[in-house]
């Protein structure tokens, strides 16, 4: 044990000498670092080592590196990079490696390892860590999503990201999180291609070019026999023209060419929509009913966010409205939290499309990270929607759907309970916006009160403090508040 401790201590000698030479730490501080590291190394050398020993050591080294970086900046040290400039992060990574070798069953440890490597921009190491983690935990959806997000967002390699998702689905066909991540991956790729095509055709300014920086132009090639078969769509097909045609001026195009291009673009839009539709159909074959509904809620949230893309607009009109109505009739008899969330999305479908997201944004069926996570609601878009004269018609559609749900006795109480909870929170969030006109806000508050009265009548909900506050505020705003009015 002593030899092992001494070996690791000797590895840090060049680093400590460099720190002393640069006057970042004085002699006493160096001695203190040596003593602290020796204590940690002795703990790690024991036969019964604990995970907390590794975590404490890692946190100490991270704090030490943070202090070193601050002093380095304050002293304004210039010159070439020396060993002390990179020894800190390297030591932390090595400690994570030792920890994962010992406690390879801890998924949180692997995720912390990946996140630290991403934080210090060790791109090549992140990929290796993901591979090692997935070898130990092939059935963990979060690790697959993190690995895919790294390939797509950081490495700009959509082919590798797609290969990871297909491999994940082969091993976890019944996991809705991976299906939702796969859908968002394809949708994100299409969104990037759309933004890039807008730049190439001159329809938007170059300010949006950062959206597509580093995006690979690899085509969606044919997949192996054991992967999900999807239609092939390339960048050239998406643009609907060759690169030479893109560079032509508008004056060079005649009317017949324009008509041909429009037809071609419509065909490409249908191809892209078919890719997304196939994912939905395949997921329904592989997932249980409850898992599929959770997946579909996540699909709706993703489509809400990307409604500016023509593919999503086409898919919404041709497929999603019909699927949502069919799901409402087919699943309304099911009891469970996720079915109440689905009713909530169906009820607010028209408004969420315009708001570019479910409202509030934290009300999601399936959570995710990176490109797979939900975006926050944009106050500017909310303001535009609430001041639009058409919002009154959308509100009327919500009222009609709400009434159909309230009066439908086939919907189980448990499902209605979740729906009402989400319903009042959404109305409260929208009515609380500064852009909401007084008449609109009043109508929303009255609708909230009606929902609370329905819940009280059915006795299906025990109100928490947040719902109590919403009910009280709605009564005050509508002029019906009584000081002794409380909810059971």
From Swiss-Prot:
GO process terms (BP): maturation of SSU-rRNA from tricistronic rRNA transcript (SSU-rRNA, 5.8S rRNA, LSU-rRNA)
HAT repeat copies, ranges: 31-63, 87-119, 121-153, 156-188
Gene3D superfamilies hit by this protein: Tetratricopeptide repeat domain
SUPFAM superfamilies hit by this protein: TPR-like
Localization (cell): Nucleus, Nucleolus
GO CC term (a single one): nucleus
Pfam families the record matches: U3_assoc_6
Stated name of the protein: U3 small nucleolar RNA-associated protein 6
Organism field: Schizosaccharomyces pombe (strain 972 / ATCC 24843)
